[in-house]
UniProtKB/Swiss-Prot annotation:
Entry protein name: N-acetylmuramic acid 6-phosphate etherase
Enzyme class: lyase
Gene encoding the protein: murQ
The organism of origin for this protein: Salmonella paratyphi B (strain ATCC BAA-1250 / SPB7)
Induction section of the entry: Induced by MurNAc 6-phosphate that releases the repressor MurR from the DNA. Repressed by MurR in the absence of MurNAc 6-phosphate.
Keyword Transcription regulation found: no
Biological processes per GO annotation: 1,6-anhydro-N-acetyl-beta-muramic acid catabolic process; amino sugar catabolic process; N-acetylmuramic acid catabolic process; peptidoglycan turnover
Subunit comment: Homodimer.
Keywords of this entry: Carbohydrate metabolism, Lyase
Main function: Specifically catalyzes the cleavage of the D-lactyl ether substituent of MurNAc 6-phosphate, producing GlcNAc 6-phosphate and D-lactate. Together with AnmK, is also required for the utilization of anhydro-N-acetylmuramic acid (anhMurNAc) either imported from the medium or derived from its own cell wall murein, and thus plays a role in cell wall recycling.
One Pfam family per UniProt: GKRP_SIS_N
Amino acid sequence: MNLGTLVSETRNPQTMDLDALPTPELVKRFNEQDTLVAEAVKATLPDVARAVDAAAAALKSGGRIIYMGAGTSGRLGVLDASECPPTFGVPHGLVVGLIAGGPGALLKAVEGAEDCQQAGEDDLVALNLQEQDLVVGLAASGRTPYVIGGLRYARQSGCTTVAVSCNPDSPIAREANIAISPVVGPEALTGSTRLKSGTAQKMVLNMISTGAMVKFGKVYQNLMVDMKATNVKLVDRACRMVVEATGIGREEAEALLKQTDFEVKPAILMALTGLDAAAAREKLAAHQGFLRAALEH
């Protein structure tokens, strides 16, 4: 492949004079380019929706969401995965981020790590990949061998696969069941795909993980009701969620949360139904953790 022909590697005619610009104009040019990202992502929403449903299906069948990428793409996957346990109360390891070169590559580039297809397969083998898992390959260029190797192995293993790339008709797209390709155009700094391409990938990952968790019963209305209240800020947020979802006063919300070890879902159910903590937990379990279903039935 001639990498110079990739959209993400071409020069941007709107930013040819970056080194000659005064600072206010410099940042204006970057901002102008960033405004293009949301529209590029918008064009992919039908494919993102398919990925959300696939991710939710994986979780409901006992599988995992596994992101894999190199460099910025890999770091974005690790970032999204690491935010899921505190935000949605899921165990570590339910959403996994793999980066070419291993954890050390998060802080320091591991040269050449992305160029090995076998490494992508090996990292999935080490995770004991199961067919219920969803594998999401991330590569701005769309041709990273590490990601191609991982996606190919995942499909051979019976997994549903998703490819996220910022170039059209990319090699990783051809390896996946679902291809998401927000084409953001040439970067302001030629080839620096940590810029618009990274932003687009982050937006897509936000929707995949958050959408899947909504479908997995981790959200009520627009509240993160399975959040772990592990610090002062989050305890306060838990109280506010109970107040906002039920209309009760803060003192009553705090009293209910103390009975549930600051678990928000049973506290809301208690406030709205009069159940005690044990009965609220039992009813939630009977509805697979979906608070709305527990309230309506």
